[in-house]
UniProtKB/Swiss-Prot annotation:
Main function: Regulates vegetative and gynoecium development. In concert with HUA2, antagonizes FLK by positively regulating FLC probably at transcriptional and post-transcriptional levels, and thus acts as a negative regulator of flowering.
Location in or out of the cell: Nucleus
SUPFAM superfamilies referenced in this protein's UniProt entry, alphabetically: Eukaryotic type KH-domain (KH-domain type I)
Gene deletion effect: Subtle morphological alterations in pep-2 and pep-4 such as leaf alterations, phyllotactic errors and sporadic presence of small fruits with multiple valves. Occasional asymmetry in valve growth and unfused carpels. Rescues the flk mutant late-flowering phenotype with a concomitant decrease in FLC RNA levels.
Keyword Repeat in annotation: yes
Transcription regulation keyword on record: yes
Name of protein: RNA-binding KH domain-containing protein PEPPER
GO cellular component terms given for this protein: nucleus
Subunit structure: Interacts with HUA1 and HEN4.
Keywords: Nucleus, Repeat, RNA-binding, Transcription, Transcription regulation
GO terms assigned for molecular function: RNA binding
Entry's Gene Ontology BP terms: gynoecium development; mRNA transcription; negative regulation of long-day photoperiodism, flowering; negative regulation of short-day photoperiodism, flowering; RNA processing; shoot system development
Occurrences of domain KH (ranges): 73-140, 165-234, 340-403
Length: 495
């Protein structure tokens, strides 16, 4: 005991086994802590948090590491029907003012061309990296709730209103659309699978005339709640595309410049079209009079073009010398706006096969013959379909006439031995001639609900591969048609 006491007095500790260093040789305390760091969850930050810290510096950093206006603004452009603008603004602007105050974002409905049924809602707000949902994202979802009729709060009425078919579109840059698709379509596919809504990027031919050449449309369709989930995922992905606060006004200025350009070109184009109509009816001796009048309009055209000012700096590129006169996007806008018309027809579902045809032969023929863009959509009524026709006035009229001809030639089902009869060239049905009682053209607002049985008709030399897949559960009339490769410029349409 005396030896033990002497050791304690001289060394200050007792040389017991539990006081020996148990860390193996070659290992430091720091290395051992790193190996056992799994026991401390707070020490294992995920890669996403590390990336977030790299992308968005800490708020305690000095101001010298940031730039003026850091981190930037989020900008979203929603395309809504003009009939829904009142639901966004409210009486005396109460709704839009309340949304701006609650979300701390800027919401503005831009003026559009007179003949277009759409309006662009410009939504912008300063990005908040620490927030789960930025002010601009919150404003986008609130605007969609107002447009689709969803209540602001998640209550019992949400399930009833959320099952209604709805749609919404976003106007984005081409680079954002490509990024949204992802590698081999993986990103947009995951959004569709997780939300259950239909999400697609419209082609350049389907892009509206008021969009620039480097812009695309993101189209969402489906039930309102599913669209809301998909819209949240899309804007959550696009929130990384930030712009400086000084760039936000350019979105509105360039859009209004394109609109004003089309308004200036409209009366001039109408004058030219009337002149060409007169020239087609003139006789040979009057050709000299036409030759004297034509240069007047050409001179007027040059004077109008000379007054057009440059459009300024491009939002998505570094080229500051794009001009309104030589911009291919503006040239396409002015030429398309002059006679752009949109017409909607409500057709009984019993005539769907007559309009579409076997393997889409009839609808492909109508598109080729008229040159119009024809989209078949679902109707709020289960026994009807909506046919939307877009194009010039003559194209829309031709398409309507062809559709009415197919409806008039609708045949009642009869029993034919041996299946289909011999098919002659042209567009003669394969059934025995039996005229239908419906011999009057169907108006665009036809709301008839008379159930009519029908059988598929076949037309020669118009076949093409097609696929019919249901798009909405619980609806026996939902299908998707993909036209043949020989019909270019037209994407799928939903029934």
């Amino acid at each position: 005991m005396a030896a033990v006491a002497d050791s304690v007095e001289n060394n200050g500790s007792i040389n017991l086994p539990e006081n020996e260093n148990l860390i193996p040789a070659g290992f430091s305390a720091a290395a051992l802590l790193d190996e056992n760091s799994g026991a401390f969850p707070e020490l294992n930050q995920p890669d996403s948090l590390a990336a977030a810290e790299t992308t968005f510096p800490d708020t305690n950093d000095s101001a010298e590491e940031r730039w003026p206006g850091w981190p930037g603004d989020c900008v979203f452009r929603m395309i809504v029907p003009v009939t829904k603008v009142g639901a966004i603004i409210g009486r005396k602007g109460d709704f839009i003012k309340k949304m701006c105050e609650e979300t701390r974002a800027r919401i503005k409905v831009l003026d559009g061309p007179v003949n277009t049924p759409d309006r662009i809602v410009l939504i912008s707000g300063k990005e908040e990296p620490e927030a789960y949902m930025s002010p601009a994202m919150d404003a986008v979802l609130r605007v969609f709730r107002r447009v689709s009729g969803l209540p602001d709060n998640d209550d019992d009425d949400v399930q009833n209103a959320g099952s209604v078919f709805s749609s919404v579109r976003l106007l984005v840059a081409s680079t954002q659309a490509i990024n949204l698709i992802g590698k081999q379509g993986s990103l947009i596919k995951s959004i569709v699978e997780n939300s259950g809504a239909s999400v697609r990027i419209l082609s350049e031919e389907e892009t509206p005339f008021y969009a620039a050449q480097d812009e695309r449309i993101v189209d969402l369709q489906g039930e309102a709640l599913k669209i809301l989930k998909a819209l949240e995922a899309i804007v959550g992905h696009l929130r990384r595309f930030l712009v400086d606060h000084t760039v936000v006004p350019l979105f509105e200025k360039q859009y209004l410049a394109r609109v004003s350009q089309t308004r200036q070109e409209e009366p001039l184009a109408e004058s030219k079209s009337s002149l060409h109509t007169i020239s087609s009816n003139l006789m040979e001796p009057d050709f000299s009079l036409l030759a004297r009048r034509e240069p007047l309009f050409l001179e007027r055209d040059s004077r109008v073009d000379s007054r057009v000012q440059p459009s300024g700096v491009s939002i998505y590129s570094q080229d500051p010398v794009l001009s309104a006169r030589h911009s291919p996007g503006l040239a396409r806008v002015s030429s398309a706006f002059v006679t752009q018309v949109s017409q909607t027809m409500q057709i009984p579902f019993s005539y769907a096969e007559d309009i579409i045809g076997v393997e889409g032969a009839n609808i492909a023929y109508i598109r080729r013959r008229s040159g119009a863009t024809i989209t078949i959509k679902e109707s709020p009524h289960p026994d009807q379909i909506t046919v939307e026709i877009k194009g010039t006035t003559s194209q829309v009229q031709t398409a309507e006439q062809l559709i009415q001809e197919f409806i008039i030639n609708h045949k009642e089902p009869v029993s034919v031995s041996g299946g289909y009869a011999r098919i002659d060239s042209g567009y003669v049905p394969a059934y025995p001639p039996q005229l239908s009682n419906r011999q009057e053209p169907l108006p665009s607002t036809y709301m008839g609900t008379e159930p009519v049985q029908y059988r598929p008709t076949a037309y020669s030399q118009l076949g093409g591969p097609s696929t019919y897949t249901p798009t909405l559960t619980g609806q026996t009339y939902g299908s998707e048609y993909r036209p043949a490769s020989d019909v270019g410029g037209y994407s799928s349409y939903n029934l």
